[in-house]
Regions:
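N-terminal hydrophobic/helix-forming segments and targeting peptides
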Residues: 1-287
Length: 287
């Protein structure tokens, strides 16, 4: 039994042929197969041919969904290995933080927007921006998991993402979040530009919203193991579960809660004060 399937997402061509997949029917029964060919240039999405272990004539139908065939999620050495952390971890963190935020006074205006079709170019976010699903005066903290690099390690704490490979995000909101987190002296967090992909904050900023991003460092980005080694032809291309740090995840929930709690509180204008002190001290050099 062979199936022709579309692949909706961003995975490099080398990872497809030979990879195991699991296809689900409408009763959530799974059927194991192997990708035997890839049509990388097919439009609008790549297409693959999957050879199943057994016939499924009349069982699997159009629009049934497949995923890579991995073991169930597990935690080892403080790391969660799961078929999809991007962006289920962000969804889970948003809901967990909202449960905390709802218990705090004065934060009834805080809400969560979940969008669809993020992996094919955040189409849901674009639609939300164009249709003004969110009020234009909203401040948007987009949540992501983003490919880890040596300078943005897994386990180094949740990340205030100042930009992605396409753009930098709203400086006013990013700087406010930075000031808030700098005040948390014992909190482990990172402030990084994460160039491994493009996120919804880019779309929202482009459509005139005030937005920045909080994210988790991600291993095996988009289920691609050893990305750099594969690109350099030093490693075989194999799909693998995505990986995040459990402590980073809990930190993201706390970070989101803290920023929402403190965003409207008065803050010392430390940067402006520093700049004014500097010009007062050295203005004679300009004469």
């Amino acid at each position: 039994q062979h199936l022709e399937m579309e692949f909706r997402g961003g995975v490099n061509d080398a990872y497809f042929v030979g990879a195991k997949v699991e296809v689900f029917d409408n009763e959530d029964n799974g059927y194991i197969g192997t990708v035997i060919s890839l049509q990388a240039q097919a439009k609008p999405f790549k297409r693959v041919i999957v050879k199943l272990k057994k016939g499924v004539a009349g069982i699997l139908i159009k629009d049934d969904i497949a995923r890579w065939n991995f073991k169930p999620p597990f935690v080892k050495d403080g790391l969660l290995h799961a078929p999809a952390c991007d962006d289920l971890a962000g969804v889970a963190a948003a809901i967990a933080a909202l449960e905390r935020i709802q218990k705090l006074p004065g934060l009834g205006h805080v809400g969560v927007l979940l969008t669809r079709a993020e992996e094919i170019g955040f189409v849901g976010a674009i639609a939300a921006a164009k249709n003004k699903t969110v009020a234009k005066n909203s401040r948007l903290l987009c949540l992501e998991t983003s490919r880890s690099f040596p300078e943005s390690p897994i386990g180094g704490g949740p990340i205030l993402r100042v930009g992605d490979k396409t753009s930098v995000f709203g400086p006013e909101l990013t700087n406010a979040a930075t000031e808030i987190m700098n005040a948390q002296k014992k909190f482990l967090w990172q402030r990084k530009l994460m160039p491994g992909g493009t996120c919804e904050s880019t779309a929202f900023c482009e459509y005139g919203y005030v937005s920045t991003c909080l994210c988790l460092a991600l291993g095996n980005y988009h289920n691609m193991k050893d990305i750099d080694g594969v690109l350099q032809k030093k490693k075989p291309a194999k799909v693998a579960p995505e990986v995040i740090s459990v402590s980073d995840y809990h930190g993201l929930v706390s970070m989101l809660t803290i920023i929402c709690r403190d965003l409207d509180k008065p803050r010392k204008a430390t940067l402006r004060k520093s700049l004014e002190t500097r010009i007062h001290k050295y203005k004679k050099l300009l004469s």
